[in-house]
Amino acid sequence: VNVADPTADPDAVSLYLQGVTMTSSTGAPCILGQSAGKLKLTCSGINTLTDTAAAANADTSGVIYGDCDITVTKNSTGTLNITSSMNTAIRSKDDIKLNGGNISINTDVDATSDADAIRANNTLEIDGASVTVTSSADGLKSSKEDVSILSGKGIPLILSSPHFINFFAYLDQLVKIHY
């Protein structure tokens, strides 16, 4: 993991993942963004992040967690595989934007798993990323604002979750789909 020069955007932390494999066996996030204005991830190659234990603090649980905006940048050309047996895969107390790369999330690991796949307190936007979600709980969740799926580029969004029945039943209220 390389940390970019913070002088380009002093409020942002940029991480470049190039063939990274990380496992958290303590419940702590593999990537933790605290006290930053933004956390920007750029992925190349195949990157795999996994957790195998529940977080001690449910408020900060997530394989990738930030109390700031989290963005997977449009410059991502690689794959980000996230497997979580106990915690939300990507969680932000602010916005989440998935703008590039191939993102595959599995939170439906075993019978005891009950973790959301992607959860933002504010806006959740997918625009330019190929996203595959298998979730034992909510697949895409925003607590306060919209979930936006912007399309038109032939980018697939594949969702599998017992909660998607409710998700799609309220599609006009929860999700803005732009073509």
Regions found by a protein language model. Give the residues of each.
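A composition-driven surface/loop motif
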Residues: V1-H163, F167-D172, Y179
